[in-house]
Amino acid sequence: MSKNSYCYQINLQFFASKKGVGSTKNGRDSHSKRLGAKKADGQMIRVGQIIYRQRGTKIFAGQNVAMGSDNTLFALSDGIVRFQKFGSKQSKTRVNIIKHQLNA
């Protein structure tokens, strides 16, 4: 090397300008199933209308009420919905339809 020549060594380091983003296992949810009472005690109901949607037998079928394959309770006749407690400690609930002619 000559007297006037200089040797420079450049050491460049590049740093991340943005943090590396990872994925998450959260952030999703299932759609609600809209379970529960569709008709209240004392309401008028028509044949085939749903009274109660449920998983399992929380409410039992009484007179003029049938249970579908998914445990949904529905009316077998026109009338008025009546919920009734029964069992040894009144711990179970049954729904009945009191037959009543509805005006069309």
Swiss-Prot record:
GO BP annotation list: translation
Residue positions assigned to the propeptide: 1-15
Maturation and modification: The N-terminus is cleaved by ribosomal processing cysteine protease Prp.
Example GO molecular function: structural constituent of ribosome
One Pfam entry name: Ribosomal_L27
GO CC annotations, alphabetized: cytosolic large ribosomal subunit
Gene3D superfamilies in the record: 2.40.50.100
Origin: domain of life: Bacteria
Keywords assigned: Ribonucleoprotein, Ribosomal protein
Keyword Ribonucleoprotein in annotation: yes
Family in the record: Belongs to the bacterial ribosomal protein bL27 family.
NCBIfam families assigned: L27
HAMAP family with a match to the protein in the record: Ribosomal_bL27
Protein's name in the database: Large ribosomal subunit protein bL27
Organism expressing this protein natively: Mycoplasma genitalium (strain ATCC 33530 / DSM 19775 / NCTC 10195 / G37)
